[in-house]
Each structure stands twice: as C-alpha cells, then as structure tokens.
C-alpha cells in the first residue's frame, strides 16, 4: 500500500501533524491530491490554490494536504484521517475520490466536504469543476493548423466523463478547421507516471502523429516533443519552461479564487454544498501565452477564446 504523505503548512513554517493551541481557533482547511504537488500539473495547481488561501486569509486559517493518495481504500483512510485530525473543510481533487468522500462525509456530518469533477452530493458534500473542455476546443483548432500530418497523439488517463469530454471537445475544435483531422489515442491508466507518459508520447510520434496532447499530469510528454523538435500542449499548468520550443499553449487551472471564497464562506458560517462549474469566462480556466505559432494562428485562438467569454 502506498504510504500516505501529509504536510501541515502553518505561518510558523514547521511541518507537523500536531495542532497547536494557537491554531485551535483557526479554521482548518485540508486538501487531498492524487499526485505529488511537484507534478507541475494538476495537483500542483490545486496546491497553488491552497497557498492562495493562506496568503489571502492569513492567520484565520490553517491548511494541510495529503499527496500521492491512490484512488480506492487509501482514499477512504485519507479523508477519515483528515476529519479526525480536525479538518473542518476538506477538498478532494480527483474523480476517483468521489465514493470515498461520500462515505466519509456521511460518517462526519459536521465536517464540510467538496469534491472536484464528481457528481454526487449530500448535506455536507458539494461538488465543483471547471470547463476544461473550452480550452481543449482551442487546442484542437491550433493542432489542426499546426500539424502537417493532420494527426495528433493524445495521451489519456482513465475513461471517465471529464476525459472523454476533453477528447470530444478537442476533436470538434480540430475538425472545425480540418474535417479530416485525426487523433491517435493511448490510454495509460494513470494520472501521473512520467515514464509511461513519455513512452506513450514516443509511440504516438513513431506512429505518425506530429503534435502531442495529454490528459495526464506530468511534463514528460511535452519534453519528448521538445527533444524531437515537434509541438505539443501543456496540461493544467504552464509548462513552457520544460519545453520552450515545443509548447504552443497550455490550459491552466486557477483554483485560488474559488478556494478562497469557499474557505471564507466556512469562516463566515455561510457555507452550503454547491454544484459549481467554472470556465474561461470566470477565470478558473486560462490559456497560457500562445507561443511557437504564426500570428494568424494566434489570432484565431484569441478570437475563439473571446467568443467563449462573450458566450
């Protein structure tokens, strides 16, 4: 069983599982991540949101997180552990955490829970998501313009609604530019495994794709594109520093404002379980700088982005 790692971040900087007398008066907000916060992708961006909470709310809050939590029995234990250790608001950030959160939320009715990308709610469990498909439509348009082969390699994690939605949106965007555009797909059945992601990228390039897309969390696939002199897109975070010549753009997740608002609601006593779906218009989904592409392609992407914002 993968060992659960916990880090408790306080303004005094020490890492500890103990709650001090001073911290006892604070609201303790906690996060559970399926990957490491150093993935520079999905889990990293959620953790940046946690840090935004600390900066915005200061000594009103105490935060903690668990990283590298497997979806399954480990998740049950992770959520229960945090609830028992005094977390009053707990965010689960992976689709596979849904049933564990439902189970633990029922067991701890006085604790507030939120689950990202899921669909099950209860009196003390809300859900939240972002319209990542909006960004994937733009990626598809760019890919169709930039790919000489008319073929993208698409690395995907698990066959869940969020991932399938992303594939469909990407292809709709691509085929709005080139009706004959195709994508070759590799399912790696993991959110974060740099080795598998790199191998998948190499295989897709070897099979004729000349641009890479991913719904996994590491920078490995984009780095393969950089090594081969090909193009690709970052995922969840701006990965330009890992592939300065290969990255065309990246869908970036900005969870900070949402997390701040929900923790503030918990502090105010106004928190209620919600069903929130944020997008480009709300600033939760952002496109990083459009780079390594002609001006006309950049203008096309910016125009599509504006249309999405304008509705």
Q: Language-model features: where?
A:
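Sec/Tat signal peptide C-region and signal peptidase I cleavage site
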Residues: 17-23
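Bacterial N-terminal signal peptides
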Residues: 7-16
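A residue-level marker of the well-folded mature domains of exported/periplasmic proteins
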Residues: 24-311
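Positively charged n-region of N-terminal signal peptides that target proteins for export
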Residues: 1-4
């Amino acid at each position: 069983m993968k060992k659960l790692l916990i880090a408790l971040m306080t303004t005094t900087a020490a890492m500890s599982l103990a709650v001090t007398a001073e911290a006892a008066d604070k609201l303790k907000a906690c996060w559970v991540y399926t990957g490491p916060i150093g993935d520079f992708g999905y889990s990293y961006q959620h953790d940046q949101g946690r840090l935004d909470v600390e900066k915005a709310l200061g000594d009103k809050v105490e935060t903690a997180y668990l990283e590298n939590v497997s979806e399954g029995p480990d998740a049950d234990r992770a959520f229960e552990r945090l609830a028992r250790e005094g977390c009053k608001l707990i965010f689960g950030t992976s689709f596979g955490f849904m049933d564990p959160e439902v189970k633990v939320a029922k067991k701890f009715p006085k604790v507030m829970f939120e689950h990202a990308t899921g669909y099950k709610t209860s009196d003390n469990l809300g859900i939240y998501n972002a319209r990542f498909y909006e960004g994937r439509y733009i990626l598809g348009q760019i890919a169709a313009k930039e790919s000489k082969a008319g073929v993208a390699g698409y690395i995907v994690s698990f066959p869940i609604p969020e991932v399938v939605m992303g594939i469909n949106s990407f292809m709709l965007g691509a085929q709005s530019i080139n009706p004959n555009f195709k994508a070759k797909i590799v399912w790696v059945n993991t959110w974060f495994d740099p080795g598998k992601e790199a191998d998948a990228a190499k295989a897709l390039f070897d099979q004729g794709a000349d641009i890479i897309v991913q719904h996994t969390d590491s920078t490995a696939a984009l780095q393969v594109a950089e090594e081969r002199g090909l193009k690709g897109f970052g995922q969840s975070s701006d990965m330009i520093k890992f592939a300065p010549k290969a990255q065309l753009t990246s869908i970036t997740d900005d969870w900070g404002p949402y997390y701040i608002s929900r923790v503030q609601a918990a502090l105010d006593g106004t928190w209620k379980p919600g069903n929130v779906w944020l997008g480009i218009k709300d600033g939760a989904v952002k496109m990083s700088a459009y780079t390594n592409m002609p001006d006309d392609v950049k203008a096309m992407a910016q125009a599509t982005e504006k249309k999405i914002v304008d509705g």
